[in-house]
């Protein structure tokens, strides 16, 4: 049985693990071969010292090796946030994902129940009528037939059960808050990834570059793990193997500045109702911010040349009923397991 102790000793000594050492250490963690106190100590030592790009790459590699994979088209995109920004907004990436699917780009969305808000994407999708507890074949069919499939993280990363109790007991952020969005079970190489703190924007773009991602924007928007309409969004874009950084404002999307209070969500029931209201034509701050995130996703996917074009396509998807049709089709296919 492999031992975590040598790796624990290194990080306790503020030494950095190589990529391979991190892979080995996380393999031990996710194989149930470390004690709860070792897991807690290891995760906090990393957190206090600060996780490096190589350590995150090694950890993601271990996590991907253990996940339950899903088949998806090569051009599928994931629109996902780390969660943990503490603001409890509506499920912005969820609505953006349906808009993108309605615009004709396959979406392989990975997500979980709420971490710090009252409703994560899984909570809201469950209320909408989407069946979460489905196998990889059904999810692949959802992506093929509805243009969007939802992968419920805990079903695809069962090895996480070995670290779950320690994470709950620690009650604070660990490296695992970053890993989930980097371990998409469908292997999506295109991604809009929102992070909970600005210092992670560039490092996570570097991680995804090292993991051979194709086209990615890592974003943090004025406190949110989304592109925001409440202020400035920091972006690290990975395109053609190169990372460039820039900032976006609501004006770049042709949108007015919004107040955070107008984006405050509730529980799964409230958030599902808000999402359906936008699908029914309600024009509000939730619609605007979701359109902005969808527009960026359409640029990442190569479907739109510019954010202006992306906004036009996204609005067409919503206003034509294509977004609502993608949702209804996903509900139907996810509940039909024949």
Swiss-Prot record:
Coiled coil: none annotated. InterPro entries: Anthranilate_Pribosyl_Tfrase, Glycosyl_Trfase_fam3, Glycosyl_Trfase_fam3_N_dom, Glycosyl_Trfase_fam3_N_dom_sf, Nuc_phospho_transferase. Pfam families: Glycos_trans_3N, Glycos_transf_3. Binds 2 magnesium ions per monomer. Homodimer. HAMAP family: TrpD. Catalyzes the transfer of the phosphoribosyl group of 5-phosphorylribose-1-pyrophosphate (PRPP) to anthranilate to yield N-(5'-phosphoribosyl)-anthranilate (PRA). This is Anthranilate phosphoribosyltransferase.
């Amino acid at each position: 049985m492999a031992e975590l102790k040598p790796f624990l000793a290194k990080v306790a000594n503020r030494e950095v693990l190589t990529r391979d050492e991190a892979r080995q250490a996380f393999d031990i963690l996710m194989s149930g071969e470390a004690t709860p106190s070792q897991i807690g100590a290891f995760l906090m030592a990393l957190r206090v010292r600060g996780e490096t790009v190589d350590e995150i790459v090694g950890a993601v590699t271990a996590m991907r090796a253990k996940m339950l994979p899903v088949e998806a088209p090569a051009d599928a995109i994931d629109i996902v946030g780390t969660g943990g920004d503490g603001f409890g907004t509506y499920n912005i990436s969820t609505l953006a994902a349906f808009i993108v699917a309605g615009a004709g780009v396959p979406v392989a969305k990975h997500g979980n129940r709420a971490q710090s808000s009252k409703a994560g994407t899984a909570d809201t999708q469950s209320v909408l009528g989407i069946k979460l507890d489905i196998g990889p074949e059904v999810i692949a069919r959802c992506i093929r037939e509805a243009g969007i499939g939802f992968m419920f993280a805990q079903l695809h990363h069962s090895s996480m059960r070995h670290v779950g109790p320690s994470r709950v007991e620690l009650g604070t952020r660990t490296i695992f808050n970053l890993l989930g969005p980097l371990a998409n079970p469908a292997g999506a190489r295109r991604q809009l990834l929102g992070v909970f703190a600005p210092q992670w924007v560039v490092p996570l773009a570097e991680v995804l570059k090292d993991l051979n991602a194709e086209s990615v924007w890592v974003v943090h928007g004025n406190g949110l793990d989304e592109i925001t309409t409440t202020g400035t969004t920091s972006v690290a874009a990975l395109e053609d193997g190169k990372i460039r950084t820039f900032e976006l404002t609501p004006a770049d999307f042709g949108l007015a500045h919004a107040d955070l209070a107008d984006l405050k969500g509730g529980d799964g029931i409230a958030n599902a109702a808000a999402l359906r209201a936008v699908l029914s034509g309600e024009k509000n701050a939730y619609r605007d911010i979701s359109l902005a995130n969808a527009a960026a996703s359409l640029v990442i996917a190569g479907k739109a040349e510019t954010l202006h074009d992306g906004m036009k396509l996204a609005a067409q998807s919503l206003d034509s009923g294509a977004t609502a049709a993608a949702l209804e089709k996903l509900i139907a296919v996810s509940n039909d397991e024949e």
